[in-house]
Amino acid sequence: MDLTPREKDKLLIFTAGLVAERRLARGVKLNYPEAMAYISAALLEGARDGQTVAELMHYGTTLLTREQVMEGIPEMIPEIQVEATFPDGTKLVTVHQPIV
């Protein structure tokens, strides 16, 4: 399989997002990289499903709560930016204060 660097990045985010999803399902609080991967993967999948940038900006704030992450993680992630592929091209999705 010959993947571009961009495709490798997306695959890594998706894989880390799956690990985070499984840990959440077991009740394990997510650390920084897991929280980033979980939200980023969800945003990438949402773009692939046809959601708009505005919808994803809101959706990104509903994925995790303070109770689901380790102490101090919400303050470490003031925003998340993901370059996602939409039906009409690639766009930057920015989610401010993703963990409430």
UniProtKB/Swiss-Prot annotation:
What Gene3D superfamilies would the database entry show? Urease, gamma-like subunit
Which terms in the GO cellular component ontology are assigned? cytoplasm
Coiled-coil residues are none
Which Enzyme Commission number(s) are on file for it? 3.5.1.5
Q: Does the keyword Cytoplasm apply?
A: yes
Gene Ontology molecular-function annotations: nickel cation binding; urease activity
Biological process, per Gene Ontology? urea catabolic process
Give the record's pathway: Nitrogen metabolism; urea degradation; CO(2) and NH(3) from urea (urease route): step 1/1
Q: Which UniProt key words apply to this protein?
A: Cytoplasm, Hydrolase
Signal peptide: which range, if any?
none
> Which protein family is it in?
Belongs to the urease gamma subunit family.
NCBIfam families given in the database record: PRK13241.1, urease_gam
Can you say what this protein is called?
A: Urease subunit gamma
Organism for this UniProt entry = Pseudomonas fluorescens (strain Pf0-1)
**Lineage of the organism:** Bacteria, Pseudomonadati, Pseudomonadota, Gammaproteobacteria, Pseudomonadales
This protein's gene is called ureA
